[in-house]
Amino acid sequence: MYLNFYGLKEKPFNATPDPKFLCLTPGHREALAQLVYSVQENRGFLVLTGEVGTGKTTLLQAFRQRLNGKAVVAYVLDSTLPFEGLLEYMLEELRVPTPASSPAQRLLALRRFMLDRRRAGQTTVLVVDEAQNLDTAALEKIRMLSNFETPTEKLLQILLVGQPELRVKLNRPELRQLQQRIELRCSLPPLSREQVCDYILTRLRIAGAHDLGLFSEQAQTRIAVHSRGIPRRVNILCDHCLVIGYADQRRRIEVDVVDQAIEALEGPAGSRARRFTSPVRATWQRWFVGAVSAAGLTGMYLLALARHVRDLFIR
């Protein structure tokens, strides 16, 4: 929608992680280097934590690339599964034929696979995302997987990835045996104001922007403060700024555009509850969305009309 207007080749602030837009801060680079080194050294149990939106998924994509064929990785996304489901998920990711008879046979099949990979010069890595959702029983059984080893080294490297609640869970007394096996704990901090500004400029550059001053310094500072340094929030806010700037034919994003984007995302201060609890207003909002869709309105006119109706609703 706004690409041609701002001279961009692609959207710079997509919410979906894209390795092409990888922007590693010093904190991200340090965490990535520690993770890769720990896997290469067969450390065993690793933990990575960070708030929602701090770039854990993006970092894991880079982690997988940096291993560069030296490891086979099973990436488990559904941490709500019981251990048997996690094991089946892992075997499927690794393309290990899964005997249907018993969990013991599945474990033996996994061990044979890992030994074969070790003979081929590769290590096996299990990554469990959103690991704060794992219950104590599943965590304890995952710990037991780390018992797979040769006389000289671990066959399986385990990386638990999650939100800060994971750190709290791992400190429970009943998980003390698991605690003792953790060789590395690293976390992703929010971005500083300067890092947010660098992040915005880097993504604009990768997207093909000729004008890297598209966001004024004041606008970047406002985005940094409001996003609290969380990359996902930066992306969402910047994308809304470009949409609103395009609708208003603004070649430069200033603070007032950022404030409009914040209002569009969160509502005016003090009025959010009132807007969302009014059944009449909600009915008109639903009618408006349906009418616009039926009319097939797009682009700048749709945005301008939507913002006008929004302003009517919040008065």
Predicted regions and their residues:
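A short, basic N-terminal segment
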Residues: M1-E41, M300-R315
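Structural recognition of the conserved hydrophobic beta-strand(s) that form the central parallel beta-sheet
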Residues: T49, V125-D129, Q157-Q163
